[in-house]
A protein has these predicted regions:
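Residue-level signature of mid-helix packing/kink "hotspots" within the transmembrane helices
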Residues: 27, 55-63, 113, 147-148, ...
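Extracytoplasmic gate region of multi-pass secondary transporters
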Residues: 29-30, 224-281, 342-343, 347, ...
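Helix-breaking motifs and short loop linkers at transmembrane-helix boundaries and internal kinks
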Residues: 41, 73, 88, 94-100, ...
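Conserved MFS/SLC helix-loop-helix module at the cytosolic interface between two early adjacent transmembrane helices
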Residues: 60-99
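Structural signature of the two symmetry-related core transmembrane helices
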Residues: 76-90, 298-316
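Cytoplasmic helix-loop-helix junction between adjacent transmembrane helices
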Residues: 104-144
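Helix-loop-helix hairpin linking two adjacent transmembrane segments in secondary transporters
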Residues: 143-192
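A membrane-interface helix-boundary motif in multi-pass transporters
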Residues: 159-172, 261, 300-303, 382-398
């Protein structure tokens, strides 16, 4: 008996690498904020708007990005958008004012907008349904691992060549990934020469037959009329707001409020995201294990996500009010671990409810979520200026409780019905 090849796992590994690069490019500016502020004389609020500019571009172009992946296929779509955002990653180093930096960050966000929806679409043709939670967990773990390593790497590069150097280095890394992706990936297993018959049959039997390379038409009416999807979107709004606090401002918080010097900031700022990496891996894996043992998709997705949000809410408050800076970092690790337990599950739900249109459905979710992510950096700056650093974190804890409540209403077993999607 011929054993199936394992090409789908190489596809998954390339997708993990893409997720790592998205977050490395995204969070590198956070580690450079103290140096950029000093050079340009930007206020905290101005820096907040610069950080928000990326997320507005990212949020507003989610749906076009997901649509692009569904229409032309992930191979070409990801190659195009990663090239785009890598160029604007490097362009950030050429900014000469607050406005120019906002424009470059906005255009960078436009490119990154399609990354996760298109990558989700790329996995929908390759990963077995019982592997989806793990696949989403490990890809997002890759993104958080990239983010965790970035502060120390950025500080290292800045110490030798200035704050602009990391933007050029990371931009080049993205272009290298494009060359590998376009050369190896194919939109369906049937198109890949290295996939043997046994692996094709394994994938087809799990999915009920071969799937088309691209979707003929996206059923937008059915998508936008799904109450299940809108609940998912509201939940992800809360999540994205909370995680943005840590992605965009945690290094600055440690430097200004907790008294860490630049070197210690670089070392400690990545620890919560390292804990988040473990959360991503465990959340998706445990949800899939729960599904295999119980056969109950609804409970397998809900249980993990609700537990994660409650853990996050419980970790944020002691991190905020402890007087010990190291205890603050440790409690923050617990909070981000809880937040990231929810991510693989959240991104598995679009695959569960609309696999043929996973790119479009996940883009709607990610757009709504990242409106929260776009509001977060600027609002935090205003809250800190008007009150103190504690208020934004208390707000994040409250939003975690709201997200947990919303997930009690999300049903991963309720598929979006349309002429092209079987209910």
């Amino acid at each position: 008996m011929v054993r199936p090849t394992r090409v789908r796992y190489t596809v998954l590994a390339l997708t993990v690498a893409a997720y790592m690069i998205t977050y490395m490019d995204r969070v590198m500016i956070a580690a450079a904020v103290p140096v950029i502020q000093k050079e340009f004389g930007f206020s905290l609020v101005t820096m907040g708007w610069i950080l928000s500019a990326f997320r507005w571009g990212y949020a507003l172009f989610q749906i076009p990005g997901g649509w692009l992946g569904d229409r032309i296929g992930p191979r070409r779509a990801l190659s195009l958008i990663v090239t785009w955002w890598s160029l604007f990653t490097s362009a950030t180093a050429l900014a000469w004012s607050a406005v120019s930096m906002m424009v470059f960050r906005f255009l960078f966000g436009v490119g990154e907008a399609g990354a996760f929806p298109i990558a989700t679409r790329s996995l929908s043709r390759w990963m077995l349904p019982a592997e989806r939670g793990f696949a989403q967990g490990i890809t997002h773990a890759g993104s958080r691992l990239g983010a965790a390593l970035t502060p120390a790497l950025v500080v290292f590069l800045m110490a030798r060549w200035g704050w602009r150097a990391p933007f050029f280095v990371f931009g080049a890394l993205g272009l290298l990934w494009v060359a590998v992706w376009y050369g190896y990936y194919r939109d369906t297993p049937e198109e890949h020469r290295s996939v043997n018959r046994a692996e094709r049959e394994l994938i087809h039997s799990a999915m009920g037959g071969p799937r088309p390379r691209v979707s003929a038409a996206v059923p937008w009416r059915e998508i936008f009329s799904s109450a299940n999807l809108w609940t998912l979107c509201l939940m992800y709004f809360c999540y994205a707001y909370c995680i943005s606090v840590y992605l965009d401002w945690f290094p600055k918080y440690l430097h200004d409020h907790r008294g860490f010097d630049l070197t210690r900031m670089g070392l400690y700022a990545g620890l919560p995201l390292l804990a988040g990496t473990a959360g991503d891996l465990l959340g998706g894996w445990f949800s899939d294990l729960w599904l295999k043992r119980s056969g109950n998709l609804r409970r397998a997705r809900r249980g993990v996500a609700i537990g994660g949000f409650l853990l996050a809410a419980g970790g944020i408050l002691p991190a905020t009010f402890t007087a010990d800076p190291l205890a603050c970092v440790l409690y923050t690790c617990l909070a981000v671990f809880g937040l990231e337990l929810t991510v693989g599950v959240s991104w598995a739900v679009p695959l569960d409810i609309a696999s043929d249109y996973a790119g479009s459905v996940s883009s709607v979710m990610n757009m709504c979520g990242n409106i929260g992510g776009a509001i977060s950096p600027a609002l935090l700056a205003y809250l800190v200026r008007s009150y103190n650093w504690e208020v934004p974190f208390v707000l994040s804890s409250m939003l975690c409780l709201v997200a947990a409540a919303l997930f009690t209403r999300i049903d991963a077993a309720r598929r979006i019905s349309s002429p092209g999607v079987t209910a």
